[in-house]
Curated annotation (Swiss-Prot):
InterPro entries: GrpE (IPR000740), GrpE_coiled_coil (IPR013805), GrpE_head (IPR009012). It comes from the Bacteria. Belongs to the GrpE family. CDD domains: GrpE (cd00446). This is Protein GrpE. One of its GO terms (molecular function) is adenyl-nucleotide exchange factor activity. Keywords: Chaperone, Cytoplasm, Stress response. GO terms for biological process: protein folding. It comes from Pseudomonas syringae pv. tomato (strain ATCC BAA-871 / DC3000). It is found in: Cytoplasm. Pfam families: GrpE. Participates actively in the response to hyperosmotic and heat shock by preventing the aggregation of stress-denatured proteins, in association with DnaK and GrpE. It is the nucleotide exchange factor for DnaK and may function as a thermosensor. Unfolded proteins bind initially to DnaJ; upon interaction with the DnaJ-bound protein, DnaK hydrolyzes its bound ATP, resulting in the formation of a stable complex. GrpE releases ADP from DnaK; ATP binding to DnaK triggers the release of the substrate protein, thus completing the reaction cycle. Homodimer.
Length: 187
């Protein structure tokens, strides 16, 4: 009987060890899953942090690049006025020649300064119309050029660092309409 009790005790011990082994295996699996989830979350947080840093750097870069946008926009009417003044003055009139030369020099210095800050004029005369950079003020029939070609520029457009600041206001060509026959030709 003592042997049976020893066998029962050994069986119980083995069963307890097997149960404890199953518990340990289950516990190890749970801990491994938690570890994997924590590592995954850590990677996601690191990736999010890197994305936030990259976006912040891009925002700062854009802020530096386009900080002059409002100021440059306020300068455009001044450039327009100087150009209009030159266009309206007679280059052959000796009485205004010194003033005209002064305006020309001022305008050139102004344009050179703006170019240094990547503010560039859009003067599309003779180019195909582009809705991205031009604003059509009128359409005019023309057999001399292809349809949708800029015939006249009312006001130059400007770009700052490649971004449109003001579209060019233009007259765009269209194909001539077919001549309508007169009443005599129809008969």
């Amino acid at each position: 009987m003592a042997d049976e009790q020893n066998l029962d005790a050994q069986a119980q011990d083995q069963a307890a060890e097997a149960g404890a082994g199953d518990e340990l295996t289950t516990r190890v699996q749970v801990l491994e899953e938690q570890l994997a989830a924590a590592q995954d979350q850590s990677l996601r947080v690191a990736a999010d942090l890197q994305n936030v840093r990259r976006r912040a750097e891009q925002d700062v870069e854009k802020a530096h690049k386009f900080a002059l946008e409002k100021f440059a926009g306020d300068l455009l009417p001044i450039i327009d006025s100087l150009e209009r003044g030159l266009d309206l003055s007679n280059p052959d009139d000796e009485s205004i020649r010194p003033m005209r030369e002064g305006i020309e020099l001022t305008l050139k210095m102004f344009q050179d300064t703006l170019k240094r800050y990547q503010l560039e004029a859009i003067d599309p005369h003779g180019q195909p119309f582009s809705a991205d950079q031009h604003q059509a003020m009128a359409m005019q029939e023309s057999a001399d050029v292809e349809p949708n070609t800029v015939l006249k520029v009312f006001q130059k457009g400007y770009q700052l660092n490649g971004r449109l600041l003001r579209p060019a206001m233009v007259v765009v060509s269209k194909a001539p309409s077919p001549a309508t026959p007169s009443i005599n030709e129809q008969a």
